[in-house]
Amino acid sequence: RWHDLGKLHAVFQDSMYRCRPPADPAQPLAKSDCAGSMRHSRSFFRHELASMLGWLAQHDGEADADLIAYLILAHHGKVRMSLRAMPNEQADPDFRRFARGIHEGDSLPAMEFDGEHSVATTLRLALMEIGIGDQGPSWSERALGLLERFGPFRLAWLETLVRLADWRASAAEQLEPRQGGNP
């Protein structure tokens, strides 16, 4: 479930509750009742990036943390090897770094899920920088290291396994709708 931790982000939750008022505002939603495609208040918002940053904030330095971070980031096939702002993406003037709708200093609340515990986390984007910074090696350096370690085909295979598992879990949840539903 770490791959959907970013669904706890305020931008994502605002989007989820847009079509229905919260019965319990403390209960996060993972799926929306809105018809059509999701539009977030921040253009280009990707919950996968928030999930990956939350994972690394709590697990960086552990065995295979970069691989898990990569798989979290890539689980919808939109973001993989680079962290960057999109063309025409704009942040508030107060934010130093921003990418894919995530602003430096955004936060994720604490969450208990599947026997895991995620602490409240402030998201940092120093990984966007080149070289080694205050979060260690840049994301580009980490991703290229994974590419070198696993090769493009094995890395793509691992990504495919995670994406298929996510699709199957989503399909199973839709067969048995829940009230709310933790990310």
Language-model segments: residues:
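Divalent metal-dependent catalytic cores for phosphoryl transfer on phosphate-bearing substrates
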Residues: R1-G180
